Amino acid sequence: MVIMIKHLASFALCAAALFPTFSQAKYQPVTIDNCGVTTTWQTPPQRVVTIGQHETELLLALGLEKNIVGTAVWFGALPPSLQSAGKGLTRLAENAPGFEAVVAQRPDLVAAQYTYHVGEQGEVATRQQFAGLGINTWIAPADCVGKSLTAGSNGDGGRDKPFTLDLIYQEIDALGKIFGVTDRARALAATLRNRVAQAQHTARDALKHNAQGNVVFWFSSTRLNGDPWVAGSAGAPGWIARTLGLTNIIHTAEEWPAVSWETIARRDPDYIVVASMARRLYPADDVEQKLAFLRSDPVTREMTAVKRNRIIVVPAMSLNPSLRNVDAVEAISQRIAAFHTGS
């Protein structure tokens, strides 16, 4: 069951009423280094194309929906509390947009969730290509700080330093300064911190009399009966596990390594967190097919988590570095509490 969390965007719905916009307050120029590119902002961006759902949701949560002129790279629907603010957004593409489609929106800023799309080998374009047209770029710090591709990593890369939500808080702070909405940014970060603290309390209460605390996070697979992409210990799911007092059974710095079901079964997780998404690039993108596989495959159906039906479904967005990591912390803590109270 997907647990929908309401808090995040309810903040955004009233943000404009609570705080003055940058047009109403004196803008303070700011210089910020972002993933190796230093930019001085003399005025806030007016026309933004977001490439990556996290960037879209972050701007919506800051009450900046009127600044978004195009979006791309969607994993699923917006959370209910952001849907009203985001209902008029233009989708240039569900996945990566073309360079021309982005430029046609006449953006003064392109904000990307992944260096894969806007980086040295950018699938959409490089930062230099955009700069040549006078377009500034922004890449989510969580996709470049402490992260790298190695000879042994897949396209998702690995982490030199474990992810924490501090990277998201840093991005909120930086974008608050860039757009001149620092009050909104501070309030959003405070709301997220309070929600994390409450989720930790819920998980501690549920686990204090129970030894079971091993977890695996399954994102997708190219084939249902092939090796699944599961979360390593240094990415966002690793932070989620540590925050809730759980132990990720996959001990690698790679973000989403492919690991055999036989290996996972030997480690026998107490909980399996499964990603739900609208994307359909691979058979295992479909959460219903994932669940059916877990309950029917001769190897997976013998795992403790499957036998006890301790499977937790969360939106895929909440397992990648984003605001929605807080949604995942809440959803997982609530389900664990329900498992151990029988509710």
For every predicted segment, state its role.
Residues 32-36, 90-100, 253-260:
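Short helix-initiation/N-cap motifs at beta->coil->alpha
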Residues 76-78, 227-256:
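Alpha-helical, coiled-coil/dimerization segments enriched in small aliphatic residues
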Residues 99-106, 124, 259-268:
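Short helices/loops that flank or line small-molecule/ion binding pockets
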